[in-house]
Amino acid sequence: MKNQKNLAGVLLFIAGIIIFMGIITAESYYPLDDPYTTRENEISDLGATKPPNSIIKQPSANIFNTTMILTGIIILCATFLLQLESQNLLLTVPLGVLGIGVVGVGIFPGNITPWHSIFAFILFTAGGIGAILSYRFTRFPINLVFLVLGVIALFFLFFNELFIPYLGKGGTERFVAYPILFWMIGIGSYLAGTIQKKSAS
């Protein structure tokens, strides 16, 4: 890697892929005797459901929680590299808070209240804001995509009660989480790709 921004972009891209595949893997290992559905179950139910009567299913819980902790650390490393390279606070502040939220979700599964909910809210809020703010320093037309992803994430986060009757708790939460995940993969690709293009010229 020729510079820190390029490496940070690659790390964000990798973190997004690991989260996505980690969720899929944890879902695939969830026991069939207690079905997990994307409509009724929140993503974090893979780690542990909320009290009372919290349910923890292995190996799904270990897969999910480990994935969150690992990727949160990767995001924080990327944030550190970006701060050293550009000191773009519009990116590094929400990204750093996002990383802290991801780590917190892994350390404090759904059965640990109120900490899990606090870190999940931090994660979703920071991710949505980060996606919207990235409109300011990325180029057209991808900046519009990032803006829309951020708006979708925050809209479903703060108005989730409107959509739960139609999408379920799990479906509604995924309209918050997945746009943030797609933004993280996208901004990672953007940071890596633009630097490579400049280096080649």
Describe the residue ranges of each PLM region:
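Terminal transmembrane helical module of multi-pass membrane proteins
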Residues: Y135-S201
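Membrane-interface helix-boundary motifs at transmembrane edges
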Residues: K2-K5, C77-L91, Y135-L144, T194-A200
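Hydrophobic alpha-helical transmembrane segments of polytopic
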Residues: A8-I19, F64-T67, T71, L91-L98, ...
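N-terminal signal-anchor transmembrane alpha helix
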Residues: N3-D33
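Interfacial helix-start motif at the membrane-water boundary
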Residues: L46-I73
